[in-house]
Swiss-Prot record:
Pfam families: Hpr_kinase_C, Hpr_kinase_N. Homohexamer. It comes from Staphylococcus aureus (strain NCTC 8325 / PS 47). Transmembrane segments: none annotated. Keywords: ATP-binding, Carbohydrate metabolism, Kinase, Magnesium, Metal-binding, Multifunctional enzyme, Nucleotide-binding, Serine/threonine-protein kinase, Transferase. Residues 199-208 are annotated as: Important for the catalytic mechanism of both phosphorylation and dephosphorylation. The gene is hprK. HAMAP family: HPr_kinase (MF_01249). This is HPr kinase/phosphorylase.
Length: 310
């Protein structure tokens, strides 16, 4: 759970008042600048957000009649308000300090400019409050594409990752991948701290990839864009041989491209994954070989049908 105390420690902010409220949870990544509230309009006050007071808000506050000031500040300090932050190192109004002390609302001062602090806060909160999950698999950076390799236990995921590392690609996580959703369409994968940089090879044991292959062979985290699912070759199953069938894998409501690769002796899975990653990059650049082939095939069929009619 993210608390105001962790926010203060991580961003190195200065607490002025409301120390007893540091244990308040932060549940909303949005940030509010209470301009209308300063004017007395609290009907739609987003009190569960962090409140940011900059030069504009405080200069307007100084124009308020003395009789209204204390009341406005008390209304800002709701029980669910995680923090009120004054930017640019400005001096908080005395009425705000008193209200924060009395109502246990953390009052914080930051030296950053308002827009700069808002950017820092947004980045921090989006990461800290992102939805998370974990998946059994291996995450590798192949030609800049985050490839999540999945499949049944013993199918050869770790061995394939080792071959990819030897070919110059970078390991992110083996066996267990911790995934968090930053945006609606952005998934970031990283390893648990316990097994960071480690790779388990059956018959060999656990190896430290960074020690063996150097710092350039590992990454601490990577955006997941492509899923390669390995499965034992099934003669009864029809596998995609053209590339027109688009499969997807849903993780935390985010869809990523999925390719199912049948595994059998003699197939170089690492090379296939390299080609899949390069082909994915071509696809997002607007080049789809499967569609081009399909169009050429259709044109040839139409041409031949016209010849037969003649």
């Amino acid at each position: 759970m993210l608390t105001t105390e962790k926010l203060v420690e991580t961003l190195k902010l200065d607490l002025i008042a409301g120390e007893e409220g540091l244990s308040k949870p932060i549940k909303n990544a949005d940030i509010s600048r209470p301009g209308l509230e300063m004017a007395g309009y609290f009907s739609h006050y987003a009190s569960d957000r962090i409140q940011l007071l900059g030069t504009t808000e405080l200069s307007f506050y100084n124009l308020l009649p003395d009789k209204d000031r204390a009341g406005r500040m008390r209304k800002l300090c709701r029980p669910e308000t995680p923090a009120i932050i004054v930017t640019r190192g400005l001096q908080p109004p005395e009425e705000l300090v008193e209200a924060a002390k009395e109502l246990n609302t953390p009052l914080i001062v930051a030296k950053d400019a308002t827009t700069s602090l808002m950017s820092r806060l947004t980045t921090f909160l989006e990461h800290a409050l992102a939805k998370t999950t974990s998946l059994h698999g291996v995450l590798v950076d192949v030609y800049g594409v985050g490839v999540l390799i999945t499949g049944d236990s013993g199918i050869g995921k770790s061995e394939t990752a080792l071959e990819l590392v030897k070919r110059g690609h970078r390991l992110v996580a083996d066996d267990n991948v911790e995934i968090r959703q930053i945006n609606k369409d952005e998934l970031i994968g990283k390893p648990p701290k316990l097994i960071e940089h480690l790779l388990e090879i059956r018959g060999l044991g656990i190896i430290n990839v960074m020690t063996l292959f150097g710092a350039g062979s590992i990454l601490t985290e990577k955006r997941i864009r492509l899923n390669i699912n390995l499965e034992n070759w099934n003669k009864q199953k029809l596998y995609d041989r053209v590339g027109l069938n688009e499969e997807t894998l849903s993780i935390l409501d985010t869809e990523i491209t999925k390719k199912t690769i049948p595994v059998r002796p003699g197939r170089n899975v690492a090379v296939i994954i390299e080609v899949a990653a390069m082909n994915y990059r071509l696809n997002i650049m607007g080049i789809n070989t499967a569609e081009e082939f399909s169009e050429r095939l259709n044109e040839e069929i139409i041409k031949n049908s016209h010849k037969s009619e003649e």
